[in-house]
Regions:
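A short, histidine- and acid-enriched strand-loop-helix "catalytic/donor-clamping" loop
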Residues: 72-76, 145
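Phosphate-coordination/substrate-recognition cap region in phosphate-metabolizing enzymes
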Residues: 61-64, 72-73
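Active-site regions of metal-assisted phosphoester/phosphodiester hydrolases
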Residues: 1-43, 49-55, 64-67, 81-229
Length: 229
């Protein structure tokens, strides 16, 4: 199926645990939902997501929108963390719990897979969805503050995506936490700062869009359109 002509709009955004700069002092789910609703995308790759947000985001967005998530770190006693994070998000920060999430709009998810990339110093995960076209789209948040570790995470993710795709086109995006990154056999489709999109078997069409998110998050969303390569 993946041989058919296709167009896929991919967005990657680190949500900074649902916080803003300056601090809002309250839950910002409505604002993040509105921002995502206002942008064009087929697949949104999200990092540092409050674990209770993916389903709520999918429900708030015009769709249909499907969500898939994988928990990352600081999720013990999650109901307690959630109660504190909803009330004081800027005080508890990342201790509210963490997840990566993929939202898919207007397309069904045929399969979802996850693989742990490392345990230490924090659990890092790769997650990916297979679309009905056969294209795989992967999402990761690499280790922060350690360039060799971040590159290791990215390489493990690349190898895994090659295995999962089995020759089909695929996309790998997210917060790589390292600059100047290249991945063997993959095309750099676009990015900003440490937030990148790579592709295999697909090519970018048009410009890389760094989207205006106002005060939300400390990362800018990046969107690219991919077509048959």
């Amino acid at each position: 199926m993946y041989g058919a002509a296709m167009r896929l709009r991919v967005l990657t955004w680190n949500l900074w645990h649902g916080r803003s700069d300056p601090a809002a002092g309250r839950d910002l789910l409505p604002e993040f939902s509105a921002a995502l609703q206002g942008w064009e995308w087929d697949v949104a790759l999200l990092q540092e997501v409050p674990p209770w947000w993916p389903g709520a985001l999918a429900q708030r967005l015009q769709g249909p929108v499907e969500d898939r998530q994988v928990l990352t770190s600081r999720n013990a006693l999650l109901p307690v963390r959630r109660a504190l994070a909803v009330r004081w998000p800027d005080l508890i920060k990342s201790n509210g719990g963490g997840a990566n999430a993929i939202l898919v709009r207007g397309i069904s998810v045929a399969e979802h897979r996850t693989r742990r990339l490392c345990w230490w110093p924090e659990r890092r995960q790769l997650q990916a969805v297979r679309l009905p076209t056969g294209v795989w789209v992967g999402n990761l948040h690499a280790t922060v503050g350690d360039d060799p570790a971040a590159r290791r995470d990215a390489e493990r993710a690349r190898v895994t995506m090659v295995q999962w795709a089995g020759g089909a086109p695929f996309v790998l995006g997210g917060d790589f936490n390292v600059r100047g990154l290249s991945l063997a056999g993959l095309t750099f489709a676009g990015g900003y700062d440490v937030d990148f999109v790579f592709a295999s078997g697909l090519a970018r069409a048009g410009d890389v869009d760094v989207l205006d998110r106002g005060p939300l998050s400390d990362h800018a969303p990046v969107a690219v359109t991919l077509v048959d390569g």
